[in-house]
């Protein structure tokens, strides 16, 4: 999980979602997991 000020999709399988008011990227590739904060 990377925590970044701005999250972006890295590949086609990445999905940007909102969970509990936080913007997150989830993906099949676990290296692409990101959270805004």
UniProtKB/Swiss-Prot annotation:
<dbReference type="GO" id="GO:0005737">
    <property type="term" value="C:cytoplasm"/>
</dbReference>
<keyword id="KW-0689">Ribosomal protein</keyword>
<dbReference type="InterPro" id="IPR035977">
    <property type="entry name" value="Ribosomal_bL36_sp"/>
</dbReference>
<dbReference type="GO" id="GO:1990904">
    <property type="term" value="C:ribonucleoprotein complex"/>
</dbReference>
<protein>
    <recommendedName>
        <fullName>Large ribosomal subunit protein bL36</fullName>
    </recommendedName>
</protein>
<dbReference type="GO" id="GO:0003735">
    <property type="term" value="F:structural constituent of ribosome"/>
</dbReference>
<comment type="similarity">
    <text>Belongs to the bacterial ribosomal protein bL36 family.</text>
</comment>
<dbReference type="GO" id="GO:0006412">
    <property type="term" value="P:translation"/>
</dbReference>
<dbReference type="GO" id="GO:0005840">
    <property type="term" value="C:ribosome"/>
</dbReference>
<keyword id="KW-0687">Ribonucleoprotein</keyword>
<dbReference type="Pfam" id="PF00444">
    <property type="entry name" value="Ribosomal_L36"/>
</dbReference>
<dbReference type="InterPro" id="IPR000473">
    <property type="entry name" value="Ribosomal_bL36"/>
</dbReference>
């Amino acid at each position: 999980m990377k925590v970044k000020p701005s999250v972006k999709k890295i590949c086609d399988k990445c999905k940007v979602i909102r969970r509990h008011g936080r913007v997150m990227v989830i993906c099949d590739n676990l290296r692409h997991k990101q959270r805004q904060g």
